[in-house]
Amino acid sequence: MMMNSFFPAMALMVLVGCSTPSPVQKAQRVKVDPLRSLNMEALCKDQAAKRYNTGEQKIDVTAFEQFQGSYEMRGYTFRKEQFVCSFDADGHFLHLSMR
């Protein structure tokens, strides 16, 4: 009786070990319209200036990252306070996070 269940289980383990590894998935890179990214940067600077009670000229945006359904801009104030602006896939401002 034990032999009847042993062979199918053993065959299953052998077949599982023979499967090929799944291909590595990579994020798709879509070229962002320069005008859109400049508008997003201006909006990010405006929101950060309001949050930190300073002028836009004292805000630096240092990084722009694109994710599957959103964008993030990282930056800091002249006092070295870091923040992240988040945007949806269409470039609409979502929120500003202080870091």
From Swiss-Prot:
It comes from the Bacteria. The keyword Cell membrane applies. The keyword Lipoprotein applies. It is found in: Cell membrane. Residues 1-17 form the signal peptide. GO terms for cellular component: plasma membrane. Coiled coil: none annotated. It is a lipid-anchor. Keywords: Cell membrane, Lipoprotein, Membrane, Palmitate, Signal. This is Uncharacterized lipoprotein YsaB. A lipid is attached at residue 18 (N-palmitoyl cysteine). Pfam families: YsaB (PF13983).
